[in-house]
């Protein structure tokens, strides 16, 4: 059986991009059980409540929901168990230092398969205040209206 090449997206955490200012991103491998991999291959996962914790020099992914494998038996995994992240030592140290110094948090952004291996994209992020969210929403709305006006103007020129 040949390995699939490229990147196959399983889940995205759109809420994280809305609730946080993303500063740095990292790609980490995941330590998974067999039924978790099979469930992910079915495209089933949720990153919404996920966060990363660094404990005794190891990075752990908490709150990510990978539902039980539908054809699994007694070997099925717990849906919300903590999962170990595979990062280089210097990456873990850098993340831990920045989280402790600047009050940042680490959130998962995307879960995907890359060359047959499950990966998670994590980000160092700073929480947005509610007025930040409203300002970002207003800016997106203004940009959308500008683009639509330009599009209508250009379309009128071609007719």
From Swiss-Prot:
Q: Where is this region: Disordered?
A: 137-159
Q: Which GO terms describe its cellular component?
A: cytosol
Q: Which UniProt keywords apply?
A: Cytoplasm, RNA-binding
Q: Where in the cell is it found?
A: Cytoplasm
The GO biological-process annotations, alphabetized, read as: trans-translation
> In what ranges is there compositional bias, type Basic and acidic residues?
137-147
Signal peptide (residue range): none
Q: Which GO terms describe its molecular function?
A: RNA binding
Mainly localized where? cytoplasm
Q: Pfam families annotated for this entry?
A: SmpB
Similarity-based family: Belongs to the SmpB family.
State its role: Required for rescue of stalled ribosomes mediated by trans-translation. Binds to transfer-messenger RNA (tmRNA), required for stable association of tmRNA with ribosomes. tmRNA and SmpB together mimic tRNA shape, replacing the anticodon stem-loop with SmpB. tmRNA is encoded by the ssrA gene; the 2 termini fold to resemble tRNA(Ala) and it encodes a 'tag peptide', a short internal open reading frame. During trans-translation Ala-aminoacylated tmRNA acts like a tRNA, entering the A-site of stalled ribosomes, displacing the stalled mRNA.
- From the Swiss-Prot or TrEMBL record, give the protein name: SsrA-binding protein
Species in which this protein is naturally found: Nocardioides sp. (strain ATCC BAA-499 / JS614)
Gene for this chain: smpB
């Amino acid at each position: 059986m040949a390995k699939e090449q490229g990147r196959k997206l399983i889940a995205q955490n759109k809420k994280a991009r809305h609730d946080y200012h993303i500063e740095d991103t990292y790609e980490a491998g995941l330590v998974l059980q067999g039924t978790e991999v099979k469930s992910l291959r079915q495209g089933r996962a949720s990153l919404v409540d996920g966060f990363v914790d660094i404990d005794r020099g190891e990075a752990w992914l908490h709150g990510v929901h990978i539902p039980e494998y539908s054809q699994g038996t007694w070997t099925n995994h717990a849906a919300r168990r903590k999962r170990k992240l595979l990062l280089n030592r210097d990456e873990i140290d850098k993340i831990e230092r920045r989280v402790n110094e600047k009050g940042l948090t680490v959130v998962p952004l995307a879960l995907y398969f890359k060359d047959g291996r499950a990966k998670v994209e994590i980000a160092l992020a700073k929480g947005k205040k509610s007025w930040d969210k409203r300002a970002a929403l207003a800016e997106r709305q203004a940009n959308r209206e500008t683009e639509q006006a330009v599009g209508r103007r250009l379309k009128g020129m071609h007719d």
